[in-house]
Each structure stands twice: as C-alpha cells, then as structure tokens.
Amino acid sequence: MYKRQAVYLRIDGKLIKSDLKLSDEMTRKLILSLLTKERQESIWRGEDADFALETSDGNRQRVNVFCQQGRLAAAIRLLNAKVPTLSQLHLPPVLQNLANEPRGLILVTGPTGSGKSTTLAAMVDYINHTRADHILTIEDPIEYVYEQDQAVIHQREVGKDVCSFAGALRSALREDPDVILVGEMRLSLIHIS
C-alpha cells in the first residue's frame, strides 16, 4: 500500500489497481494497528518490520512495513493456511528425491513471490509425513506452521525466539536436528558458516 494512491494487489504475478483508496491518515492508522510497540520503534529508527499475522480463522499473512517518502507503506502477502504438497505445486520429482536424501544442502533461490518459501514448506511437510526426523526451521517471519506427523518440528522465528539467523544456526548445531530450514541467507549468516 502506498499513501495517497489506490491499494494494489498482485494476482498471478501481475499488479492490479483496486478500487479501494485510503487517505494518508487511514493508511497510517491501519499500518500502526498491525505493529507492536517494538516494531513501531524500529520503523521510526528507519528499519523495516517484517512479520506474520494470523487471523482467528487460521489464515496467515506475511507483512512488510517500511517508510517511503517519509510515510508508512506496507506490502501484505496472503499465505495458504495449509501447506501445499509437492504434487499440488506441480514441482519436478527431483525435489521429492532430494527430500528423501539423508544428507545434503538444498538452496532454493529466486525473486520475491516466485515460490521459494512454498517450495521449501512443501519439502519440509513431505519429510514430516514420511520420516521420523527432527526438523528445525529458522525463519523471519515463520510463514507456514506445520502440524507434526512423523517428524518433530521446532520453528524458531528471528526477533521473537532468537536474536539472529547466525545465533539460531549456532544453537541449532546443539539441538540435534536432522533437517534445518534456513529461511534466508544474510551476510552475517554466511560469515559464520
């Protein structure tokens, strides 16, 4: 959302202008209502706020709040309440084969909105339903919440459960995981590896 403009939606990869227009004050109030006091303080320090919201019906949204031209703006992505399967995503069978491997490193890369998080979630959920492993996720924010099946799953959110990706990864080595999902590769994380 941008101030003094219509609200835009991205549908199937295309930006669509909606009929909804918000005043500066409405936009500010709406965005501030989503932020904790700590997140508001970080915004006023010039930092972005990246977090997930969950509605009472279990639907989740990923929210990024930022300033532009001295005003608040937000990008809000709707997330599926249920983790899709690899087959529902029409992903190649090689991803299931990789998820079956007992060891290795899998990097999923691509631009914003290309399905990286959803692909990783489908792979983690596949492992969850096929093996008795300990899965540890480190995310900012947690996007998909898994229901444990055969695996034990611990989901750690940066800024809420741990201070940083690097700290969480250091701790993870003592938590006996079989699978670690790291939601982002940041420079500080690359330095500790």
What spans do the regions from the language model cover?
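Conserved small/polar residues in nucleotide/adenosyl-binding loops
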Residues: 1-5, 190-192
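N-terminal "pre-motor" subdomain/linker immediately upstream of P-loop NTPase catalytic cores
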Residues: 3-111, 119
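Conserved P-loop NTPase nucleotide-binding/switch module
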Residues: 13-16, 141, 173-193
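Short, basic, glycine/proline-bearing loop/turn elements
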Residues: 79-82, 153-154, 178
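Short, flexible loop segments at the rims of nucleotide/cofactor-binding pockets, characterized by
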Residues: 82-87, 156-160, 182
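Short secondary-structure boundary/capping elements
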Residues: 87-90, 137, 160-164, 186-189
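Conserved glycine(s) of the Walker
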Residues: 115
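P-loop NTPase switch/communication element
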Residues: 123-176
